[in-house]
Structures are given as structure tokens and as C-alpha cells.
């Protein structure tokens, strides 16, 4: 089922028993985090806090707190269907030339559908029903969460940041956390390799000293939100991909104060600029690592205008030691990643990002090994193929007789098929998440690959062990006798 906007999604969740309305007053300061954390760990519903303490704007939390709700937001009925979305993205990322006329005709509907999902620009939009400008702009009127006791200030977490570089027609959508530092100012924490930061850098080079236009959409429809965190091919905009997920074109509207286009059905829009050179220290904040991050300097976004729907809903989350929403998103999007990786590396059987690994810091790959050194080729490919894995610190590669999602299997493979010196790949001075304080330099650290595959001639001079396999006939006989033995 597809959802036109966030409210449509809320109705759909409520009909399925996947959303709970909370009418007891709950404070955005620490209390919502506690309630959402307990609910997420219990695999509970999305939560709509209808009476946040001190505010008259409801807060939506734990929206993507289960993989099933992530799948629903992407228009799928189950997490298994996410593989089909991954196959579509794999095809669009690396389209193969048709093998003949019949093959060309079979692929034509896919390309026609992609072309037909170009965003639609509208003149009037519900996200601009109410306009607040100038001195009336006051972010303290929004129920922005203060998530952890050691957090320095309230933090906008689910803001969909819209930017455009000076040499680009396509807009970039990214989700970057934003520390509130004044009634109309937030700190835009985007890492240097992210699309928004790249657009800003190019703008400063081409238009030195001129303000950089930015818009932030809060409470967009689920397909647009999830499109911003999915590995969309560079040839496809996030808005067009959201249209594919939703089954109809994404409606956009031009901002009141700049030329950026934002989701027309979003709940709240922040419009403004970043003045080149205006920076501020950001943090500390509790993050998805389970620790407070160190303070670092990032650009300041000045909010010049807030537009919103009548009676808007504020969409929020928290991040902490897994499980949290980013970890759950990682579990669901894992199913999207598998076909994309298999398109490039057909020998990959499965790929798994354990949620305990903070969404992306560890990956387990199972493969059909075909030659000496093959496992090392695959681990290097994982690091380099998708930018989502540039911060993955540990890649474990093992054979296809191992279940990548079963630690008992994986640990058995590591401890029986690896020689630590021969089968460990260490790479130094590589990009690392700035939130990773374990790295010796902020943003720069090492990576480790573990080759836990059976070794081929050329990789070892020893006779390799044979896996113990039970006798099938004996197993069948004992199955037949089992009830008579009285053991269970």
C-alpha cells in the first residue's frame, strides 16, 4: 500500500494496530526518549504523543521502530519484498544492454515507469498553509526533543535537508541532525562527504561570501523520508525514487524565499540560509554508538521562515546504543542492499549488517568462493562499491555454508577457518565516521577484513579439514524412533 503523506501513513498504521496515541502529557525533555526506547525494544507500535508537555503540536515517535514499518513506508507488504526494491535499484544503477529485441521490449516498461515518476511541481501546498517570517520565527515553539541527560540542547533529528549545488539541476536530500542554538538558528551537522556539504562547498567556491539557500522538511511522507536514506543511483533523484515507491509522482512546491523545491505535503518547512564562515561548536550529543560524541564545529543554518500545515505534527526520534531507529532502518535496508551488491558481485550469497554493530560498522558476507584471494576481492569491493559502507570498520567474509545472520555460525567459521596473520587485512588512513572516537584521528582510521573462508591451494600448503556431516540414513532412523526413546 502506498501513502500520500505522513497523515495517510499514520491512519494506515493505526488501522493495523501499529500506532498508539498517547494522551498522557509526556515531556520532550528526556521522557519521550524513555518511552520510545522501551517501546522500540519491545517491538512496539509507533507513538503519537498528542499532549507533549508545554506544547500544542503533537510529536510522532518510533515511526520506523520495526523493519515491518520500514517496509510499509516503502510501499512493501513485508521485509521480503524489500529485495524487489533492491533489484530495481540494482538494475537502474547498472542497466545491462538488452540481449535482443524481445529483451529490450521487456525492459521498456521499467524505463517508462521511471520517466513517468519525475516530480510534479504545484503552485499551492498544504505545507505553506501557515507562514511565519522574520522576528516571529521561534524554534522554541516546536516540541523538539532533548534526548539524553548529557545533550547540550534540543536536537532536530528527522529533518530532510534540501540543497542544490551551483552546477546541478538535481536537488540533494539528506538527513542531518541539527542542534538548536537560538530562536532562528541551528547547527547543520553534515559530514564532508555528504551531498549537502558538497553542495555547500561548491557554492562557496562559485559564489564566495554569498548566503547558501537551504530548506528543511519535517514530517514528509514515508517514501520521501526513506528515499533520502536509500542508495539511489546518481541518475535518479530521491524525489523520483519516492514516486516509484509511492506509485505516484512526488508533489513539490517552491519555497517562499528561495528556488528550492520541498515536499508539498510535509508537515513543517524551515527555510533559510547558511552564511559562509558562520560556524559554531556542535555537541556533545548521545549518538547511535551509545556514547556522547566530542564537540566539533559545523555551519550555522539561519531560519528565515517557517511554513507549516494547519495543526502540524512534529516527527522526531532519538539515537543511542542499538537497538534504536537507525539500527532498525539498517536491518530493513539490509534487504535492499543485498541485490545491489549481488548485481556487482554475483558470488555474494548473503550480506548482513548486525544491528549491534551500530547500523553499518560491521558487515558479514557469505559467498561462493571460486579462486584463491577471492574473499579479499569481495571485502575490498564492499568497502568501495556503495558509499553507505565507506565507514564499515569490519568486514567478515565466509563461505555459503555459513548463515551470515547466525553468530554461532560466524564465530565457528572465524575460529576454525582463519589464521590471524594470513587472513586478516588491515587498511590504514581510511575515512571513518567522525562520531567514532576510537579512531586515532577524527574522521580517519583503519579497517579490518577477516577472511573466514575455506582456504584453497595457494593460500595454504596444508591439507584442509573436512566438515563433519551426519549419516542421513541414521538421522532418518533416529527421527522415526525418537518419540519411543522418551527423552523429550
Curated annotation (Swiss-Prot):
Q: Name one GO molecular function term.
A: 3-octaprenyl-4-hydroxybenzoate carboxy-lyase activity
Gene Ontology terms describing biological process: ubiquinone biosynthetic process
Where does this one sit in the cell?
A: Cell membrane
Give membrane topology per the record: Peripheral membrane protein
Q: Which residues bind Mn(2+)?
A: 172, 238
InterPro entries annotated for this entry? UbiD, UbiD-like_C, UbiD-like_N, UbiD_bacteria, UbiD_Rift_dom
NCBIfam families, per database record? PRK10922.1, UbiD family decarboxylase
Quaternary data = Homohexamer.
- This protein is called 3-octaprenyl-4-hydroxybenzoate carboxy-lyase
Amino acid at each position: 500500500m502506498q501513502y500520500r503523506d505522513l497523515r495517510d501513513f499514520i491512519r494506515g498504521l493505526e488501522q493495523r494496530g501499529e500506532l498508539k496515541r498517547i494522551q498522557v502529557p509526556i515531556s520532550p525533555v528526556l521522557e519521550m526518549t524513555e518511552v520510545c526506547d522501551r517501546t522500540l525494544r519491545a517491538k512496539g507500535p509507533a507513538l503519537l504523543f498528542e499532549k507533549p508537555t508545554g506544547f500544542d503540536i503533537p510529536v510522532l515517535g518510533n515511526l520506523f521502530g520495526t523493519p515491518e514499518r520500514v517496509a510499509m513506508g516503502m510501499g512493501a507488504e513485508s521485509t521480503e519484498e524489500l529485495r524487489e526494491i533492491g533489484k530495481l535499484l540494482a538494475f537502474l544503477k547498472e542497466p545491462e544492454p538488452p540481449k535482443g529485441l524481445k529483451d529490450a521490449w521487456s525492459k521498456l516498461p521499467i524505463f517508462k515507469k521511471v520517466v513517468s515518476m519525475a516530480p510534479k511541481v504545484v503552485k499551492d501546498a498544504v505545507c505553506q498553509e501557515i507562514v511565519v517570517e522574520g522576528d516571529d520565527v521561534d524554534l522554541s515553539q516546536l516540541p523538539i526533543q532533548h534526548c539524553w541527560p548529557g545533550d547540550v540542547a534540543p536536537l532536530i533529528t528527522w529533518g530532510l535537508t534540501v540543497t542544490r549545488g551551483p552546477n546541478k539541476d538535481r536537488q540533494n536530500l539528506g538527513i542531518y541532525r541539527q542542534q538548536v542554538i537560538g530562536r532562528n538558528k541551528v547547527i547543520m551537522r553534515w559530514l564532508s562527504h555528504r551531498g549537502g556539504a558538497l553542495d555547500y562547498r561548491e557554492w562557496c567556491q562559485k559564489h564566495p561570501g554569498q548566503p547558501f539557500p537551504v530548506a528543511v522538511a519535517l514530517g514528509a511522507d514515508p517514501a520521501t523520508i526513506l528515499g533520502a536514506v536509500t542508495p539511489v543511483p546518481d541518475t535518479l533523484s530521491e524525489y523520483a525514487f519516492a514516486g516509484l515507491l509511492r506509485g505516484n509522482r512526488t508533489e513539490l512546491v517552491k519555497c517562499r524565499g528561495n528556488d528550492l523545491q520541498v515536499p508539498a505535503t510535509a508537515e513543517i518547512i524551515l527555510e533559510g540560509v547558511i552564511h559562509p564562515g558562520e560556524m559554531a561548536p556542535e555537541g556533545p550529543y548521545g549518538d547511535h554508538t551509545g556514547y556522547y560524541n566530542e564537540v566539533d564545529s559545523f555551519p550555522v543554518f539561519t531560519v528565515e521562515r517557517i511554513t507549516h500545515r494547519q495543526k502540524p505534527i512534529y516527527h522526531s526520534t532519538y539515537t543511542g546504543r542499538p537497538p534504536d531507529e537507525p539500527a532498525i532502518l539498517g536491518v530493513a535496508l539490509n534487504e535492499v542492499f543485498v541485490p545491489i551488491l549481488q548485481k556487482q558481485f554475483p558470488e555474494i550469497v548473503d550480506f548482513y549488517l548486525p544491528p549491534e554493530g551500530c547500523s553499518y560498522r560491521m558487515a558479514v558476507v557469505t559467498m561462493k568462493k571460486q579462486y584463491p584471494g577471492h574473499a579479499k576481492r569481495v571485502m575490498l569491493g564492499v568497502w568501495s562499491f556503495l558509499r553507505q559502507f565507506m565507514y564499515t570498520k569490519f568486514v567478515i567474509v565466509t563461505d555459503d555454508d555459513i548463515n551470515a545472520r547466525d553468530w554461532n555460525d560466524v564465530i565457528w567459521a572465524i575460529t576454525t577457518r582463519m589464521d590471524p596473520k594470513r587472513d586478516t587485512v588491515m587498511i590504514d588512513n581510511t575515512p571513518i565516521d567522525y562520531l567514532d572516537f576510537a579512531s586515532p584521528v577524527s574522521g580517519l582510521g583503519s579497517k579490518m577484513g577477516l577472511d573466514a573462508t575455506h582456504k584453497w591451494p595457494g593460500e595454504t600448503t596444508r591439507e584442509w579439514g573436512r566438515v563433519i556431516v551426519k549419516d542421513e540414513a541414521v538421522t532418518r532412523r533416529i527421527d522415526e524412533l525418537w518419540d519411543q526413546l522418551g527423552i523429550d
